[in-house]
Regions:
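A polyanion-binding, active-site-adjacent surface
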Residues: 2-196
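Generic C-terminal helix-cap and adjacent flexible tail
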Residues: 190-208
Length: 208
């Protein structure tokens, strides 16, 4: 049962959202995760095809890599009482013809993000995963390259932790930038562990 009627109405509105439907090859299927008790917020780009099919955020190889970066098992990662997950867009955008996915639809984040984040008052750390999330929440970083932005990761703490997207497309970048694994990931793991070790409220509304 949802304790806050306003929260329940927001969830219903999101699940019924079709504002991008004419542009979505598989139709609208908004995917978000989290409870208002969540301490860690992960904001990425948009669901991939496998996530669309399974309705489970980061249920793919990108998710495997992200969980490795965070040193989290699946049980902890998918604990909605502690971890909330949003995309810049909530629905799968389709393929781009070059082996990757199309960009997230631009209508989604302005329509829903502020409303959802208002119901996540316990968030202590927000991961901005990939260029679309970074550009949306840190527009001042444009037009810097991904490498330049990630090199400045300390500048955005303690609120935001910037990361490249963990997709296969980032493999060459990771090989070319070994400092990410040796300098950034240990700090990421330490901060995530500290945030997730905090006690969770005993009573939480229904998941988002």
């Amino acid at each position: 049962m949802i304790a806050d009627p306003a929260f329940g109405r927001l969830l219903a509105d999101i699940r019924a959202c079709t504002i991008c439907a004419p542009h979505l090859p598989l139709g609208a299927r908004p995917i978000v995760r989290g409870w208002p008790s969540a301490r860690l917020l992960i904001i990425s780009q948009a669901p991939g095809r496998q996530v669309h099919d399974t309705r489970l955020s980061f249920n793919d190889r990108s998710g495997d890599r992200l969980r490795t970066w965070l040193a989290l098992d699946r049980e902890t990662f998918y604990d909605e009482a502690r971890v909330a997950i949003l995309g810049v867009a909530f629905c799968y955008p389709g393929r781009d013809g070059k082996g990757g996915d199309l960009p997230p639809r631009p209508e989604c984040a302005p329509r829903w993000h502020a409303q959802l984040r208002a119901f996540l008052p316990a968030i202590e750390l927000t991961l901005l995963v990939g260029s679309y999330a970074i550009d949306y929440y840190l527009p001042q970083t444009r037009p810097r390259s991904m490498t330049e932005v990630i090199l400045r990761w300390r500048d955005f703490l303690p609120e935001f932790f910037v990361l490249p997207h963990p997709s296969w497309r980032s493999t060459l970048w990771l090989r070319a930038n070994p400092w990410f694994e040796t300098e950034v990931l240990p700090e990421l793991r330490e901060r995530a562990a500290a945030v997730l070790s905090a006690p969770v409220a005993s009573a939480s509304p229904a998941p988002i």
